[in-house]
């Protein structure tokens, strides 16, 4: 008897109802109580039949327990789970609690990229009593706002081609991770604004060349662009490419904040024939960059590699990027600098907040030092060995406003890079689908049907506008503090103003 009643229990009621309606509509049509050509009734019959068959499938499949227990009805759970991020982003999250970037942070980039009003009435929405609230102190006698954008000269005594860099540049994002149109827009915007574009470890592509903007060539452990068939470093290929006048600096990637110690991954879905040809890798297969370099393995060898790249490139600035991990390892690099007399022209500190590379959850959340801790450590070590003046320090990691830049300068940076900030200027909506090749705005995809949504001419202007507005805001902050340059800024943090 219980088995006979099973179809009428609440968890099976959707399946039972679907089949009851299916037979009812079939009977009505068969007995000619309605016209056999009644389209709405026919559609209703087929809809109920589909749901009934779907329910049978749910009962016999073995992958999802919840579907076996609640046939048909459980699909509603999967639907709600699928649209949950969009519902949260558009309807439920506040202006300040969205992650990785809040609505306020995203909006300021959109507004500045479009040259729209970026002011806000009625005061701050931040909790000024919250533990760790930060601010910069202004002056009773503000300075004049600098008419010239802030720049920094990168290149030590042994550098023959020092580079005058903007203090705000595009951080490392590879062609392959980003679409061709995104690379075109970023690099052309960099050309218009006079700032640099880091290639990411994917290397220098034809789309970087099209824009004509200044290039920082990032050299990862995969050595893309100067790679031997066995995956090793090819000095001849590097020398032939590095003399390109568009390439202004060479950056050795030791690790990245999104996944330090894990290496790089470009999903096979994004490895098109074009990318495979540029990088020298198999088409359609995951492109894996080793977690460590093969051209060197010790701090002394790293210094030797820096000297070698500087010579092969004709004396261009050469440095390295890393996310700080074991402090003693970086101290070992500093010791090697002193012993060999070979110093990098720059060091880029990548905070673990970095996020344009897809990463395992544990690495994204818990591996590597955050930007501020890493930046302060590198600054102190360079000061300790007397090298801070000759080795410039760049930084990257969730830098999205001029205040973020001022904080970085206060902690020892000479310039800042931003990746996701410039992605927002291209139209990124933080859909968190970068690794799926299904980016809805055409920024992080190799699907030509999707990337065509990104109109290069329009987004080029927005990239330029965002950079220009950021530097202007930084100049205003610097002037309000009564300073001539943001590297004199001081950051203040208090547990509570009432303490």
State the predicted function of each range.
Residues 427-490:
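Active-site or pore-adjacent capping/gating segments
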Residues 288-451:
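Glycine-rich phosphate/ribose-binding loops and adjacent secondary-structure elements
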Residues 147-149, 153-336, 343:
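Active-site-facing alpha/beta catalytic cores
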Residues 49-62, 81:
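Transmembrane alpha-helices and immediately adjacent membrane-cytoplasm interface residues
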Residues 35-47:
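Hydrophobic alpha-helical transmembrane segments
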Residues 74-155:
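An N-cap/entry alpha-helix motif that binds or orients negatively charged groups
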Residues 492-499:
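Conserved small/polar residues in nucleotide/adenosyl-binding loops
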Residues 2-18:
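Juxtamembrane interface helix immediately N-terminal to a transmembrane segment
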């Amino acid at each position: 008897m219980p088995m006979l009643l099973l179809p009428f229990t609440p968890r099976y009621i959707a399946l039972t109802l679907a089949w009851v309606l299916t037979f009812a509509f079939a009977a009505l049509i068969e007995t000619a109580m309605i016209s056999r050509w009644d389209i709405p009734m026919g559609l209703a019959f087929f809809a109920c039949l589909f749901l009934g068959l779907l329910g049978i499938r749910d009962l016999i499949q073995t992958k999802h327990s919840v579907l076996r227990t609640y046939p048909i009805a459980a699909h509603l759970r999967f639907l709600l789970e699928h649209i949950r991020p969009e519902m949260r982003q558009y309807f439920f999250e506040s202006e300040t609690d969205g992650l990785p970037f809040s609505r306020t942070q995203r909006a300021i980039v959109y507004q500045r990229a479009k040259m729209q009003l970026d002011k806000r009435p009625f005061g701050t929405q931040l909790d000024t009593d919250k533990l760790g609230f930060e601010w910069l102190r202004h002056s009773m006698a503000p300075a004049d706002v600098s008419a010239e954008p802030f720049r920094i000269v990168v290149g030590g005594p042994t550098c023959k081609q020092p580079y005058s860099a903007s203090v705000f540049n595009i951080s490392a994002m590879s062609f392959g991770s980003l679409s061709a149109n995104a690379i075109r827009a970023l690099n052309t915007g960099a050309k218009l604004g006079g700032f640099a574009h880091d290639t990411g470890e994917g290397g220098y592509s034809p789309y970087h060349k099209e824009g004509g903007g200044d290039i920082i060539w990032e050299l990862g452990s995969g050595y893309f662009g100067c790679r031997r068939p066995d995956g090793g470093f090819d000095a001849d290929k590097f020398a032939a490419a590095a003399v390109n006048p568009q390439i202004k600096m060479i950056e050795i990637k030791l690790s990245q904040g999104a996944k330090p110690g894990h290496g790089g991954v470009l999903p096979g879905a994004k490895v098109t024939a074009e990318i495979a040809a540029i990088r020298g890798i198999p088409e359609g297969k995951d492109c894996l960059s080793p977690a460590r370099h093969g051209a060197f393995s010790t701090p002394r060898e790293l210094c030797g590699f820096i000297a070698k790249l500087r010579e092969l490139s004709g004396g261009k600035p050469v440095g390295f990027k890393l996310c700080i991990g074991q402090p003693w390892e970086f101290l070992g690099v500093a010791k090697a600098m002193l012993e060999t007399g070979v110093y990098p022209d720059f060091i880029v500190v990548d905070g673990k907040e970095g996020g344009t590379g897809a990463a395992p959850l544990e690495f994204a959340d818990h591996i590597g030092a955050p930007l501020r801790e890493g930046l302060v450590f590198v600054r102190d070590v360079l000061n300790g060995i007397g090298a801070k003046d000759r080795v410039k320090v760049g930084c990257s990691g969730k830098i999205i406003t001029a205040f973020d830049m001022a904080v970085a300068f206060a902690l020892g940076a000479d310039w800042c890079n931003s990746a996701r900030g410039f992605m927002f200027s291209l139209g990124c909506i933080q859909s968190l689908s970068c690794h799926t090749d299904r980016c809805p705005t055409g920024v992080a995809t190799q699907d030509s049907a999707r990337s065509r949504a990104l109109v290069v001419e329009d987004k080029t202007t927005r990239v330029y506008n965002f950079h220009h507005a950021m530097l202007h805001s930084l100049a205003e902050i610097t002037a309000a503090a009564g300073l001539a340059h943001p590297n004199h800024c001081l950051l203040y943090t208090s547990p509570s103003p009432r303490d």
